[in-house]
């Protein structure tokens, strides 16, 4: 496709295929990109997309899956991840934490993306610092994680609180939900 330069070998180089950012692309462009990827035997993952795009892509491959809350379309038919057991992160357990329920779509995007790459995920949602007991009551989940992704918009303090409770990497993802100083977030 003249409008897109597809990286068909990313899976071989990196252990996971190229991800398509769906926002701003027309359905026709996404159809052309998906056809090119399928023709080369690649897995498909489209982020920030819609059910309308999914319904169109089902005509190309009925095995497509739509994760509505995460806004992701996926098709996994290769075993690239399983063929690369030497990648240490595959044994990790990622915990995705959300501050509030309005942060869940971004948290689900992180969770589904991580799962697509063959990494185990647990979810811990609606545990923002306004009700800190909800987080502290689940400290066993925090301690069991190898990596924690914290998605929060309203207060922006959750990632700092979590990082003070654990000795593993904490990835902070700000969202545009709620009010306060998080600004526009993801």
Regions found by a protein language model. Name each.
Residues 72-76, 82, 120-141, 186:
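Glycine-rich oxoanion-binding loops at beta->alpha junctions
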Residues 88-131:
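Glycine-rich phosphate/diphosphate-binding loop of Rossmann-like nucleotide-binding domains
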Residues 33-39, 51-53, 63, 73-74, ...:
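N-terminal loops that bind phosphate or other acidic moieties
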Residues 25-26, 101-102, 153-156, 176-178:
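Short glycine-rich anion-binding loops that position phosphate/pyrophosphate groups of nucleotides
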Residues 157-186:
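Glycine-rich phosphate/nucleotide-binding loop
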Residues 130-150, 156-157, 161:
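N-terminal small/polar loop signature for handling phosphorylated ligands or for N-terminal nucleophile
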Residues 1-64:
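Long amphipathic alpha-helical segments
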């Amino acid at each position: 496709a003249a409008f897109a330069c597809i990286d068909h070998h990313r899976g071989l180089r990196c252990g996971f295929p190229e991800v398509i950012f769906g926002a701003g692309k027309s359905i026709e462009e996404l159809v052309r990109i998906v056809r090119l990827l399928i023709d080369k035997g690649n897995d498909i993952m489209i982020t920030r997309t819609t059910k309308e795009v999914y319904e169109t892509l089902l005509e190309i491959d009925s095995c497509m899956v739509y994760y509505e809350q995460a806004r992701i379309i996926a098709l996994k038919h290769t075993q690239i991840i399983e063929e690369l057991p030497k990648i240490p992160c595959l044994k990790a357990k990622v915990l995705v934490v959300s501050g509030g329920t309005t942060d869940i779509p971004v948290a689900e995007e992180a969770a589904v993306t991580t799962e697509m790459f063959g990494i185990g995920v647990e979810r811990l949602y609606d545990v923002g610092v306004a009700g800190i007991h909800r987080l502290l009551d689940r400290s066993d989940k925090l301690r069991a994680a190898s990596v924690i992704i914290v998605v929060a918009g309203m207060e922006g303090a959750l990632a700092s609180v979590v990082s003070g409770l654990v000795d593993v990497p904490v990835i902070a993802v700000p969202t545009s939900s709620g009010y306060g100083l998080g600004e526009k977030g993801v």
